[in-house]
Amino acid sequence: MAEERKTIFHPAGEVIDFETVFEYNPDIAGEPEKTGQFERIDYFTEVYEDGKRHPKYCNVYLPWCYDPEDREKKYNVMYYQHGNTCDPDIFTTEEGKKTIDCIFDSGEIEPCIMVFTTYYFDVTKDIEIRKTTGDVPAGDGNYGGGGIAPNFYREIVEDVIPAVELRYNTGLADGSDEAKKASRDHRGFSGYSRGAVCTWYILHNDFEYFRYYAPMSCMTTAGLPLNAERTPEQVTEYITKPIKEHSELPFFIFASNGHPNDVAPMTEQMKYVPKADVFSYGKDPEKNNFYFALSEFRHTDMLAPYYYYNSLKVLFR
């Protein structure tokens, strides 16, 4: 018997002071009828203040309906940052790609371009260390070896966005800073686990360039070391600072986590962050800008498509 869909509902006050709803769709693990394709984009970055030109790459997913000749159709772009120990190839495997295909094959979600990035400098080096601890050179500020400027937020804006969005049919008119800001309504950033930490960090540093955010299964470190203690005031200030500085810019944060056996510190932060005066909790983008969904999942990057099935029903609307 085929597994059935189910809705996981927590009323206000049960976990956080707001209700949470997560739609579990087992079809994400099915066989898609409509399939997209992946393309690799190679680029260089010089943003790390070390005098070096680092070669890097990302993987771009083009949905089944993407037509390079149709220049009139402009696609929204969702960036994905993987978790600790992983790499940008995580969803390019046969099984991984199927789960991405199934998000859009459902017919319930507007197809978008997806970009799979990495904060690691070179995923082909020190592979065993990366896959074991994840502690290899990286630009997101979470490399234990130190000595690297935490400038991945610059790499995304200065190098990745133009490399991807000027190649495909997107809302980016040219590579200027003004054009990147002007097209923010068509751009989102998301990530799982350490990639969620990176998503909060992108919101903090690149708010003028991204309208939508989908952090999955991890809290913000508020710019502090991963294992440091942080107060609710520090967390709230870190997240809301760019929003207050650019109060004219609309946004939506769709955060997700597993419960009760995933990243508990994220759920703890969600008990107070949505109460900040810059937020309106709910799923209606016309009047809300923050939502938190709780699945029953364990912790692994491969579950991200199930979270996208929820968040992409709200983001880009």
Model-derived regions: residue spans:
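Non-catalytic cap/lid and distal C-terminal segments of serine-dependent acyl enzymes
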Residues: 1-317
